[in-house]
Amino acid sequence: MAISKKSSLYLPIFTFITMLLMVVNKVSSSTADANALHFTFNQFSKDQKDLILQGDATTGTDGNLELTRVSSNGSPQGNSVGRALFYAPVHIWESSAVVASFDATFKFLIKSPDSEPADGITFFIANIDSSIPSGSGGRLLGLFPDANIIKNSTTIDFNAAYNADTIVAVELDTYPNTDIGDPNYPHIGIDIKSIRSKKTTRWNIQNGKVGTAHINYNSVGKRLSAIVSYPNSDSATVSYDVDLDNVLPEWVRVGLSATTGLYKETNTILSWSFTSKLKSN
């Protein structure tokens, strides 16, 4: 573990505490300073103190992170929502026209006894005090607040209801909800402050197989990209141009979320890594 600090002789309190927690929980590798963050989880312990677990999320079962509720025999349960956020905040931009680039990778296992699994997994970026919004289960993926919207609501009404001012997410959506703007098939989507994705691409889920999601943000080109793949299969790729300093606060947390609804699936995370560093525009 290496620590570097250029802007001050004193480590921020959150960084110092985070480093101690990493040692205790044996995160395989990590570095942190005021302008960069790196972590890697190759497995998850039962008492994983450097993660903030919300809702039904648990760690330690076979060394994995279970984002949604499972029974004692490992069967997925319906109507469940869970999230896991990394303990240390990320410095995503600063006033001197500097924005962070980042890479995130996680391996996941989605397994469902149903013919149609639901509802999906996301990688998300939110304000540092983010919690699960009320009624955000199922199609809202643990990220966006629920609201009673009539089927033929206007775009203005829709956006006002399904909006979160400080959320950027990549969704691995396993169940199409066309009434909230989903395409009529499972898909990868990029969400900017709304559950209605800015860009989507078809995703062929492989039930019960381990997949890999890789998310990249290039701050120079201002492009957010995601690639989701299974071994020996074609990848699903989606990208969207967004200026994060116009969307997110200066300090954020990164996390993973998942939900189930009437239909269900396991939302198991086997590993997770993240690297960010501030770069000039």
Curated annotation (Swiss-Prot):
One of its GO terms (molecular function) is D-mannose binding. Mn(2+) binds at E171, D173, D182, H187. Pfam families: Lectin_legB. InterPro entries: ConA-like_dom_sf, L-lectin, Lectin_LegA_CS, Lectin_legB_Mn/Ca_BS, Legume_lectin_dom, Leguminous_Lectin. Residues 1-29 form the signal peptide. The lineage of its organism: Eukaryota, Viridiplantae, Streptophyta, Embryophyta, Tracheophyta. Keywords: Calcium, Lectin, Manganese, Mannose-binding, Metal-binding, Signal. The mature chain consists of residues 164-281 followed by residues 30-148. Concanavalin A-like lectins of the Diocleinae subtribe undergo proteolytic processing referred to as circular permutation. The propeptide is split into an N-terminal and a C-terminal part, the gamma and beta chain, respectively. These are then religated in beta-gamma order to form the mature alpha chain. The beta and gamma chains can often be detected in cell extracts. SUPFAM superfamilies: Concanavalin A-like lectins/glucanases (SSF49899). This is Lectin CaBo. Equilibrium between homodimer and homotetramer. Residues 149-163 form a propeptide. Binds one manganese (or another transition metal) ion and one calcium ion. The metal ions are essential for the saccharide-binding and cell-agglutinating activities. Several isolectin forms may exist. It comes from the Eukaryota. The record marks N148, I149, N163, A164 as: Cleavage. Ca(2+) binds at D119, D173, Y175, N177, D182. A carbohydrate binds at R139, Y175, L262, Y263. D-mannose-specific lectin. Belongs to the leguminous lectin family.
